[in-house]
Amino acid sequence: MLYLTKIRNAESEFTGNEQKIADFLRANVSELKSVSSRKMAKQLGISQSSIVKFAQKLGAQGFTELRMALIGEYSASREKTNATALHLHSSITSDDSLEVIARKLNREKEQALEQTCALFDYARLQKIIEVISKAPFIQITGLGGSALVGRDLSFKLMKIGYRVACEADTHVQATVSQALKKGDVQIAISYSGSKKEIVLCAEAARKQGATVIAITSLTDSPLRRLAHYTLDTVSGETEWRSSSMSTRTAQNSVTDLLFVGLVQLNDVESLKMIERSSELTQRLK
């Protein structure tokens, strides 16, 4: 689990003391070997229990586990940087050549994939796959780039026999949401988790007794609070990050994993359907 990433993505939710702790950890990550919770509490003017609660909020058992994990993350990051022939800053500028832009985009996407995969709770992911596999009907919602990710997933699921609706029109999305039934699944894809249209559809789905699965960021959001299950994605936000490129990369890694997991549950029949689909489309050429 990448705690530095979790700290960065959860900043908007921190209290005053939690922000002090977060700032201290990031500023002193290279020197954490010699830092105890007592020493840190004294320096920041807060209680030791506040530090322990902060660690637990991030998913660690206590400060010692968080401290050791941060030390490990810092060391791994240093080794990776030293091993890279060309170290590039993540922000793309108007002066960058196409070669430099290509390298930066590639690195940004690599980071999005690495950080997203590091956050996976695989037991929860397996449970989500099982829930989807039993759904009589699946609705996928999303806007903009997230809608493209949803459409890709819908095609894949239809290939292996699932009944799926993935409509771009928000009015149609809302109409489908209110017609869902108990046992149905809604997969809501939204990095911010705050888009009014997606939240409205999730509310309607829950009201109908459907299971809501959110593919979203770590930040607390209306969608995250509505969802029965969440799958976390991480992506770097920069001024030049147009078209949500790294966000789509992270989201696609999640949806591809869901698809492969569903294929594995019924591999023989799924592979037969994929083959039949391929044979049929070949006849259209």
UniProtKB/Swiss-Prot annotation:
Residue span(s) of domain HTH rpiR-type: 1-77
Pathway listed: Amino-sugar metabolism; N-acetylmuramate degradation [regulation]
Keywords linked to the UniProt accession: Carbohydrate metabolism, DNA-binding, Repressor, Transcription, Transcription regulation
Regions recorded as binding DNA: 37-56
CDD domains: SIS_RpiR
Repressor in keyword set: yes
Record-linked PROSITE patterns: HTH_RPIR (PS51071), SIS (PS51464)
Pfam families associated with the record: HTH_6, SIS
InterPro entries: Homeodomain-like_sf, HTH_RpiR, RpiR-like, RpiR-like_SIS, SIS_dom, SIS_dom_sf, Tscrpt_reg_HTH_MurR, WH-like_DNA-bd_sf
Molecular function GO labels: carbohydrate derivative binding; DNA binding; DNA-binding transcription factor activity
One GO process term, biological-process aspect: N-acetylmuramic acid catabolic process
Ranges of residues in domain SIS: 128-268
Function: Represses the expression of the murPQ operon involved in the uptake and degradation of N-acetylmuramic acid (MurNAc). Binds to two adjacent inverted repeats within the operator region. MurNAc 6-phosphate, the substrate of MurQ, is the specific inducer that weakens binding of MurR to the operator.
HAMAP family referenced in this protein's UniProt entry, alphabetically: HTH_type_MurR (MF_02108)
Quaternary structure and partners: Homotetramer.
Protein name: HTH-type transcriptional regulator MurR
Record gene name: murR
